[in-house]
């Protein structure tokens, strides 16, 4: 059990039978009321983000998560296959377990597979990934780096906003936390 006063970003906790990671934490002290702790939590199974307020004297169970580096192999149906980089053991995760992470998976990419009580429960993506643009409007003459933006569909099916000078076939660096264009690769 861990006190809610000891929360920090990145901490994993168990709440209502689900595993959550703390994204943001704020200690709030009311003038005449009891202090509270407001947290933003991400469900590691579904990817849903919730906000929750705890009383400052509450305790919650800490979830101990193990990580193993693995390479994404392929998708079959709604199952995604990974191979451990050290033991060469294969892991199978469902689309539901991966959530939004499927938008960044490309065969051969290395990710961290998250384990809780010996079972794979999800993955942790690198901060950025390189993906190819497969569909976007053509750039017009005079488009500059400081211009506007346009939607672009990437090889995984993800659609993001990119600068006007990006063309089909360009490789772009995408921030996996915010689904945003970073730079041309």
Curated annotation (Swiss-Prot):
One Pfam family matching this protein: EFP
CDD domains assigned: S1_EF-P_repeat_1, S1_EF-P_repeat_2
Gene: efp
Name under which the protein is recorded: Elongation factor P
Residues in the signal sequence: none
Any one biological process term the GO annotation gives: peptide biosynthetic process
Compartment(s) where it occurs, according to its Swiss-Prot or TrEMBL record: Cytoplasm
Record pathway: Protein biosynthesis; polypeptide chain elongation
SMART domains: EFP, Elong-fact-P_C
Keywords assigned: Cytoplasm, Elongation factor, Protein biosynthesis
Function per UniProt: Involved in peptide bond synthesis. Stimulates efficient translation and peptide-bond synthesis on native or reconstituted 70S ribosomes in vitro. Probably functions indirectly by altering the affinity of the ribosome for aminoacyl-tRNA, thus increasing their reactivity as acceptors for peptidyl transferase.
GO molecular function ontology, one term from the record: translation elongation factor activity
NCBIfam families: efp, PRK00529.1
Organism whose genome encodes this protein: Dictyoglomus thermophilum (strain ATCC 35947 / DSM 3960 / H-6-12)
One annotated Gene Ontology cellular component of this protein: cytoplasm
Stated family: Belongs to the elongation factor P family.
